UniProtKB/Swiss-Prot annotation:
TM regions (residue ranges): none
Cellular-component GO terms for this entry: cytosolic large ribosomal subunit
S-S bonds: none
Official protein name in the record: Large ribosomal subunit protein eL6
UniProt cross-references to InterPro entries, sorted A to Z: 60S_ribosomal_eL6, Rib_uL2_dom2, Ribosomal_eL6_CS, Ribosomal_eL6_KOW, Ribosomal_uL6_N, Translation_prot_SH3-like_sf
Organism the protein comes from: Mesembryanthemum crystallinum (Common ice plant)
Amino acid sequence: MAAAKQRKPHVSRNPELVRGIGKYSRSKMYHKRGLWAIKAKNGGVFPKHAPKSADSKAVEKPPKFYPADDVKKPLINKRKPKPTKLRASITPGTVLIILAGRFKGKRVVFLKQLSSGLLLVTGPFKVNGVPLRRVNQAYVIATSTKVDISGVNVEKFDDKYFGKKAEKKNKKGEGEFFEAEKKEVNVLPQEKKDDQKAVDVALLKAIEGVPELKAYLGARFSLKAGMKPHELVF
């Protein structure tokens, strides 16, 4: 920031002899400052500048009726959704290591980034049991291993594909209230099973073409005694 300009102290042209008493009289200073010349130019009157006109603001009329109860006005939401930036180390086909959750330590293949910012990954399921699922990029480690996924079609997969259908809960009657609740088992639709098989078939063709890649994806990642995570090269 630029340094603030220091204002110079005002120095009077009439030096003080004693505090409050100047060297020159009032009439002497009138001629010394040349005020007589300013008056002469303006017909014997000091010039006056017209005051600046204030900006005309629209007058807001007060409300005719005041509400009985004070109601807080909701704040305007000015937040604009921004697409989540993908890490430079994560590209389509990169093998990732999941760090948390049900499949912690599993190696998966990254397929694409969804509109929500989550990553679409799969094991594939036939190799290590990880199905098509969404993962936050904060909970994965990107490795230097790549898989060719040019033959995999992932256009139909989006966030709606993984959404759960909202089911309305029916109110229980008096007789059903005392009955033991039966837990409903969620059955995976056949359509999703077929989608998983189609992705697995395309991925396995690319994986089997690289030696030891299938065994690498099937092995679970773990740290042993003496291993330093910050010194590992993935």
